[in-house]
A protein has these predicted regions:
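RNase H-like DDE/DDD metal-dependent nuclease/strand-transfer catalytic core used by mobile genetic elements
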Residues: 1-4, 10-113, 124, 218, ...
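Generic secretory/membrane-interface signal
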Residues: 3, 43, 79, 119, ...
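Short, acidic, Ser/Thr-enriched surface-loop or helix-capping motifs
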Residues: 9-10, 202
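Long, charge-rich alpha-helical interaction segments
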Residues: 111, 116-119, 123-133
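C-terminal, beta-rich DNA-binding module of retroviral/retroelements integrases
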Residues: 126-236
Length: 236
């Protein structure tokens, strides 16, 4: 079993992202969204549903993902009903009709090779398949909008904080011996006067300990970096 995440530009119908994950979780979104931003730019707003990843019933509060997007000045607009997200739902059906038979024919059984092919299929769809509503390939509509100055996308400029903003962060205590918890062990980090560190879990399975959280001023100070994880924990 796997979950597919899709992102589409509402104006041009360009598929800006399509990717399979072992399951739908926060870490999957933190991997998926920046991929699309890097390829196509950062939008002013995203049209989403009332999933708990995007919406909280506590007035004045933001979800972790919404807080991350706010850092980039991306607002969230909420679809009132599932039918209101018809464009993206049709693309879910589009892939459900094509992908299983394609993977079966190509002998693809793992997510990594499936995602490699998805990138190629998505690009082919954007550039060569005429959309029945706009009567042109999505990529052509995209380029036309850019030429006519109808795009509000902002260039994606990766600053040093980029990989840490798109991680799951938590504060951990630094013990008197200068160690922090790492999986089922403890590791010694770069000596610091601080009594706590920021634990960052990345989508590639790696873990970073920072001295300060994003937005604290100055560049990130890395206290420890762990890159030996075999696979990302797709359950957070």
């Amino acid at each position: 079993m796997s979950s597919m995440l899709n992102m589409i530009d509402d104006c041009s119908r360009v598929l800006t992202g399509t990717r399979l994950y072992p399951r739908e979780c926060l870490l999957a979104y933190l991997d998926f969204i920046p991929r699309a931003f890097e390829l196509y730019g950062i939008p002013l707003a995203m049209y989403v549903d009332y999933h708990s990843f995007f919406f909280t019933h506590i007035p004045g509060n933001l979800t972790y993902l919404a807080e991350t997007l706010r850092y980039f000045d991306v607002s969230l607009l909420y679809a009132p009903t599932p039918q209101a997200k018809g464009k993206i739902e049709r693309h879910h059906g589009f892939w459900q009709n094509r992908l299983p038979s394609f993977c079966l024919a190509e002998g693809i059984r793992e997510l990594d090779p499936a995602n490699e092919q998805l990138d190629l299929l998505r690009e082919h769809h954007n550039r060569h398949e005429t959309h029945r509503e706009i009567r042109m390939p999505p990529q052509e509509a995209w380029e036309q909008a850019l030429k006519e100055g109808r795009s509000t996308l902002r260039p994606c400029q990766r600053d040093p904080w980029w990989p840490y903003l798109w991680s799951i962060r938590s504060q951990v205590r630094i013990d008197a011996d200068g160690t922090v918890p790492l999986e089922k062990q403890r590791v010694k980090i770069t000596p610091t006067y601080r009594r706590s560190a920021i634990h960052c879990r990345h989508a590639d399975g790696s873990i970073t300990y920072l001295a300060e959280p994003p937005g604290s001023g100055g560049p990130p100070i890395i206290l420890y970096r762990y890159e030996n994880a075999t696979s990302p924990p797709w359950n957070v």
